[in-house]
């Protein structure tokens, strides 16, 4: 089994955070999120696919991951390229921005994989934040947009045995300043939280219907 992590180029990272974090800070945020994800994947073979050489060097030398230099545009094409370059059939695909994922989640997925062809966990926005496939070509990948529903549609169309893994922590992907608040609440002992605290970022509750947090910098 391989775990595939597609990573966007550094120059296009987390643009919705650009008014809150500099480009260098966003890069370091990503690297720390990858450290947290790799910690959860201890004992598994990880493959990072990216077109960015700095990301690939980090993955190879710090994360000790296999690397695939992305050749084609689009998330689905990047993952398919990784499929073509690995021998393993069983795969788990996860994004690079879910630093709250834990080893316990992965242990659950591995146990469930004995009984199911496909296991999926959604993002809060209807995306796919974890996808296990017993065989890498089992379905047509349909990332982007409401991919959670699209992947379920693929599973049902093929009469696959599938399981919806419900996890708030996996559902949290980091795209906006408010998302950082979840790290402060749920991310104790993570590289990501420690990095954000070092930037002087603070989170306070918001007593209104317009969001849950006030995220600010000292």
UniProtKB/Swiss-Prot annotation:
One of its GO terms (molecular function) is GTP binding. Its EC number is 2.7.7.68. Disulfide bonds: none annotated. Pfam families: CofC. One of its GO terms (biological process) is F420-0 metabolic process. It comes from the Archaea. This is 2-phospho-L-lactate guanylyltransferase. The lineage of its organism: Archaea, Methanobacteriati, Methanobacteriota, Methanomada group, Methanococci. The gene is cofC.
């Amino acid at each position: 089994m391989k775990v595939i992590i597609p990573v966007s180029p550094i120059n296009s990272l987390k643009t919705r955070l650009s008014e809150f974090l500099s480009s260098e800070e966003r890069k370091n945020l990503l690297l720390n999120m990858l450290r947290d994800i790799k910690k959860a994947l201890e004992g598994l073979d990880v493959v990072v696919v990216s077109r960015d050489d700095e990301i690939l060097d980090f993955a190879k030398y710090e994360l000790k991951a296999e690397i695939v230099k992305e050749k084609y545009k689009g998330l689905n094409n990047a993952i398919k390229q990784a499929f073509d370059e690995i021998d393993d059939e069983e795969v788990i695909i996860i994004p690079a921005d879910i630093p709250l994922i834990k080893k316990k989640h992965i242990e659950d997925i591995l146990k469930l994989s004995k009984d199911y062809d496909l296991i999926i966990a959604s993002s809060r926005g209807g995306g796919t934040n974890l996808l296990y496939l017993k065989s890498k070509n089992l379905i047509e990948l349909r990332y982007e947009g409401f991919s959670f529903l699209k992947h379920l549609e693929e599973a049902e169309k093929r009469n696959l045995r599938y399981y919806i893994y419900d996890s708030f922590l996996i559902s949290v992907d980091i795209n906006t300043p408010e998302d950082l608040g979840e790290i402060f609440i749920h991310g104790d002992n993570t590289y990501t939280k420690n990095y954000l605290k070092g930037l002087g970022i603070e989170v306070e509750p918001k007593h209104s219907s317009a969001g849950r947090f006030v995220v600010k910098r000292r």
